[in-house]
Amino acid sequence: MTQNVNHQLLDRELAADDPWRLDGNPFERKRHTQMLQLALAQGSITNALEVGCAAGAFTEKLVPYCQGLTVIDVVAQAIARARQRIKEPSRINWIVCDVQQFSTDELFDVIVVAEVLYYLGDIAEMRAAIKNLVRVLAPGGHLIFGSARDANCRRWGHAAGAEPVIAMLNETLIEVERLECRGESVNEDCLLVRFRNPISAS
């Protein structure tokens, strides 16, 4: 599936009242609860990065626990919808950009990247995105990854899902905790993993 087709799919979904049913679906609420549990495993968050905000459903849950939060999304409409939703904009730095091109001198003690990487065109782009995220993960920081399983992602026309990306992340980070989230539908089946940067703070 090409990047243009993926962007068209994202635009179409974001036009809905409840994109991806993130607010109304019990599975999505459970997934967000588990993501937040993983993100807060080390306590309060100094500086977080959320990659891909959809319409801000998880951003709204995460921001109260962050001293600072940067949110990036390749789709301007996603950022616009999330900004309308969030009541504490002063804590959030909103950036429209691709995860592969994201550039900053900041380091983040928590990075959340869920249901995002399978929208990239191929494995090489996923590797580039992972390399970029690891670059901005603070020493000892945690990266929270979530994705539908590989079989579902491939059936949907994506290059890869959870299992191959988890293997790539394990090449440079240390897997600390893994959760499974399942709903009633065969499509509602994802893995959520917390990784730690093995480089210690000096």
What function would you assign to each model-found segment?
Residues 103-111:
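A short acidic, Gly/Pro-enriched loop at the edge of an enzyme's catalytic core
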Residues 110-124:
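A short SAM/SAH-binding and catalytic strip from SAM-dependent methyltransferases
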Residues 1-43, 47-103, 120-132, 142-202:
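Class I (Rossmann-like) S-adenosyl-L-methionine-dependent methyltransferase catalytic domain
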